[in-house]
Swiss-Prot record:
GO cellular component, one term: nucleus
Protein known as: Homeobox protein knotted-1-like LET6
Family (UniProt): Belongs to the TALE/KNOX homeobox family.
Coiled-coil regions, chain positions: none
Compositionally biased residues, Low complexity: 79-96
One Gene Ontology MF term: DNA binding
Gene designation per UniProt: LET6
Segments forming domain ELK: 237-257
Family annotation (Pfam families): ELK, Homeobox_KN, KNOX1, KNOX2
């Protein structure tokens, strides 16, 4: 950046505003608008359109409406048109720079502009900008004590400085809001990743994690490690509540499911024991109740499974002989063939009370 003496670093950013860059071709008026010393005055000031320069860290090309809202229409200064345009422009530029730097609001304007540049900038750049701002404040105080500009001497310049300071302040607020939201989002995501990847560093923390799994509470974790909050604590707490509430119902469902599984193919060892008993009693494969209980205890099956197995086995693999058919017929009508109608049809199924 270029400019006058002190504070030249920030002056060129103000020259893009177009302040004092208008030529007046009315030189025949007896009451001229300029004099020999290059002072700048106002003569029916026209309007100019000005926009703030966006900082290099953030740009937005998609919101035309917001950009249009930042446009200000400010009066700019007239200067005298001499015969040498190049010398006149240089003289006018130097005069405007001096007036801006000597204005009481110059430090405020510079601070607002540098605050926009700080948003999203690296730490070293922010430190450099703060150093420039502090240096400018020191020079501004010394300039005020030595008799700088006074508000009211140039109303157009006062309006220019005030409006642009307010515009830069508003621009800084609009830039900082999405930047802060993005930083909060990144911080939350970082905490979640730490919670997923951080392993317990001691047996105490491991035991604490097991207690949390059982109780579904994250209070202990907050006491041990305050650097982050476990995002899964709420899920574990809900899981613990559901288990405590529905554990009995889930247990009954599990038992019912196991019973349904048992209704399928019997285990190999249990089936072999039933086959062995079948072969030993092939002539009359009707186990008594006591024998069924003994088989159920040895095989691990229930009595219903044993009854079903023997029923299916007799239908598929057993046909009674002629003698057995007569016994079965007698058993179907005991009152025709036996004196004791209370007698058991099958001796092997007789209980001690009936013997």
């Amino acid at each position: 950046m270029e400019g006058g003496s002190s504070g030249n670093t920030s002056t060129s950013c103000l020259m893009m505003m177009g302040y004092g860059d208008h030529e007046n071709n009315n030189n025949n008026n007896g009451n001229g608008n300029g004099n020999g010393n290059g002072n700048v005055t106002i003569c029916a000031p026209p309007m100019m359109m000005m926009m703030p320069p966006p900082p290099p860290s953030l740009t937005n090309n998609n919101n035309a409406e917001t950009s249009n809202n930042n446009i200000l229409f400010l009066p700019f200064m007239d200067n005298n048109n001499n015969n040498n345009p190049q010398e006149d422009n240089n003289s006018s530029s130097s005069s405007i720079k001096s007036k801006i730097m000597a204005h009481p609001h110059y430090h405020r304007l510079l601070t607002a502009y540098l605050n926009c540049q700080k948003i999203g900038a690296p730490p070293e750049v922010v430190a450099r900008l703060e150093e420039i701002c502090a240096t400018s404040a020191t020079m501004g105080r010394s300039s005020s004590s030595s008799g700088g500009g006074i508000i009211g001497e140039d109303p157009a310049l006062d309006q220019f400085m005030e409006a642009y300071c307010e515009m830069l302040t508003k621009y800084e607020q609009e830039l900082s809001k999405p930047f802060k939201e993005a930083m909060v989002f990144l911080s939350r995501i970082e905490c979640q990743f730490k919670a997923l990847t951080l392993a317990p560093n001691s047996s105490h923390e491991s035991a604490l994690g097991e207690a949390m799994d059982r109780n579904g509470s994250s209070d202990e974790e907050v006491d041990v490690n305050n650097s982050f909050i476990d995002p899964q604590a709420e899920d574990r707490e809900l899981k613990g509540q559901l288990l405590r509430k529905y554990s009995g119902y889930l247990g009954s469902l599990k038992q019912e499911f196991m019973k349904k599984r048992k209704k399928g193919k019997l285990p190999k060892e249990a089936r072999q024991q039933l086959v062995d008993w079948w072969l030993r009693h092939i002539k009359w494969p009707y186990p008594s109740e006591s024998q069924k209980l003994a088989l159920a205890e040895s095989t691990g099956l229930d009595q219903k499974q044993i009854n079903n197995w023997f029923i299916n086995q007799r239908k598929r693999h057993w046909k009674p002989s002629e003698d057995m058919q007569f016994v079965v017929m007698d058993a179907a009508h005991p009152h025709y063939y036996m004196d004791n109608v209370l007698a058991n049809h099958f001796p092997m199924d007789m209980t001690p009370s009936l013997l």
